[in-house]
Amino acid sequence: MIAIYPGRFDPVTLGHLSVARRASGFCDRLIIAVFDNPAKPGLFTAAERVDFIKQSIKDLPNVEVRSFSGLMVNFARKMGASLIIRGLRVGADFEREMEMYVMNRRLDEGIELCCLFSEPQYQYLSASLIKEIVILGGDSSGLISEHVAVALKNKLASV
């Protein structure tokens, strides 16, 4: 089975990577799909985000990382995927994922959704919270990979 794990990953957190590692255990092939939205650019380019994830998942042979734009169901179809993986942290995530599930099913009934609960230590972790912590001089260790932490500090210093 081919699965897609889509997201902005701006930047990728250890919570994101935890979901990817767990999902890779029950998929033949997992594609981490980095959403590239030119209308809403992130702090890091799609290419940078793809590279950060690739550096973090080198030990997972059945996982690849690609960027995409447009509708995620179209990308999933193009990749031959029949399953979308999403991580759930708190209740608000469930509501958002349910909305997306209903719309994606309307667009393509052949693509299913699998939600994985975040591990407890990552339930309140988000990429925007990480950026705020680093901007305010806080310690991001244990929240993002070291190579991402270095890149984030450098990027924020130049903004």
UniProtKB/Swiss-Prot annotation:
Catalytic activity: (R)-4'-phosphopantetheine + ATP + H(+) = 3'-dephospho-CoA + diphosphate
Keyword Nucleotide-binding attached: yes
InterPro entries, sorted: Cyt_trans-like, PPAT, Rossmann-like_a/b/a_fold
EC number, UniProt record: 2.7.7.3
Top-rank taxon, per record: Bacteria
One of the record's GO molecular function terms: ATP binding
Keywords from the named record: ATP-binding, Coenzyme A biosynthesis, Cytoplasm, Magnesium, Nucleotide-binding, Nucleotidyltransferase, Transferase
SUPFAM superfamilies found in the cross-reference section: Nucleotidylyl transferase
Binding site for substrate: K40, M72, R86
Any single GO CC term annotated in Swiss-Prot or TrEMBL for this entry: cytoplasm
Pfam families for the chain: CTP_transf_like
Assembly notes: Homohexamer.
Name used for this protein in its record: Phosphopantetheine adenylyltransferase
Organism from which the protein derives: Dehalococcoides mccartyi (strain ATCC BAA-2100 / JCM 16839 / KCTC 5957 / BAV1)
Name of the encoding gene: coaD
